Amino acid sequence: VNFVEFDAYFDRFATDVFRLENLQNYAVDAEDAGLKAFREGTARPERSVRTEPWLARIAVTTVAGKIWQRVHVVDHPLTEYLRYEMESYVESQAAGERIRIADRAAAESALSGLGEDFWLFDGDSPKAYAVLMHYDNAGHFVGFDHAVEPAILDRCRHERDVALRHSMGLNTYLASGKAVATTE
């Protein structure tokens, strides 16, 4: 699968898409300017359905009745990157994505078995498929694999269910005050 094909998955799914994120840092070149602004305490440009195609896609598909869900498993204190990402999550949630945060320490035995990051499309349908995301130790994206094998889909479904069960909604997490903790 290439990037064009992967991107098209977000236009083709029928009912739901789920994202599991386990890393504490992602090295994404496209986020460098935003992360720099966050680090310096300057306002970043508006990100909304009017300005960002990704957010518009989420909004259009959720209005059509499709479900976007994401769980990020986090360690405390949060890394600078995760504190920055929480701001992006607020924007994605405003577009319609259901974002949840799982505190690894609060459910360590359950969450320790989660594997690599993935996207699961139409997870409970006979046409389900997953995209397994691969990153190096520094959080740089190195590739992905399209998966339709029953064992892989079963693992992704199980990990989705565990992550959802042991997570809280983004607003609840942000209200807890844990998102302001810093490693610096």
State each model region's role.
Residues 1-74:
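PLD-like (HKD) phosphodiesterase/transphosphatidyltransferase domain
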Residues 18-22, 69-72, 99-103, 120, ...:
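A structural signal for short, well-ordered beta-strand segments and their strand-loop junctions
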Residues 27-29, 78-81, 140-142:
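Short catalytic/ligand-binding loop motif for oxyanion handling, primarily in non-cytosolic enzymes
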Residues 44, 49-55, 102-107, 112-114:
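Short acidic (Asp/Glu) patches
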Residues 76-112:
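HKD-type phospholipase D/PLD-like phosphodiesterase module
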Residues 107-147:
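HKD (HxKxxxxD) catalytic microenvironment of the phospholipase D
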Residues 138-184:
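Signature of lipid phosphatidyltransferase scaffolds
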